[in-house]
């Protein structure tokens, strides 16, 4: 992902304030609620029958944190996202058979959740920088797909 120095500063500056467990659980939960077909990858998570069930599900929250921990790792390697996410791309492609479009959807949901959490601090410039990053991460995660 090519970001200007200003964009990198905006992304990393805001990310330092993100509560990964909270934002990760909310982002994954919203993905599962808004795009219910994504739930098929989470059969082992128990009750996903309603929005409150999904949003309160401890396994959704835990996996959301795990997802954002990986995203944090990616932010430290913006110049090598494909390398950073190679193993995860392989896992999601070969073993889990996740539709790569879901990575794009989750990235967009994450941007919405960040906007909700940070309000006015999430300026159009910050949003534009994050859109570039989530697109780059989604692209890197889809890299191993044939």
From Swiss-Prot:
Residues recorded with modification N-acetylvaline: 1
Modified sites of kind S-nitrosocysteine: 93
One annotated Gene Ontology cellular component of this protein: hemoglobin complex
Swiss-Prot/TrEMBL GO biological process terms: hydrogen peroxide catabolic process
Keyword ATP-binding tagged: no
Residues bound to heme b: 63, 92
Keyword Metal-binding recorded: yes
Expression sites (tissue/organ): Red blood cells.
UniProt KW keywords: Acetylation, Heme, Iron, Metal-binding, Oxygen transport, Phosphoprotein, S-nitrosylation, Transport
Function as written in the Swiss-Prot or TrEMBL entry: Involved in oxygen transport from the lung to the various peripheral tissues.
Protein name: Hemoglobin subunit beta
Organism: Pteropus poliocephalus
Originating gene: HBB
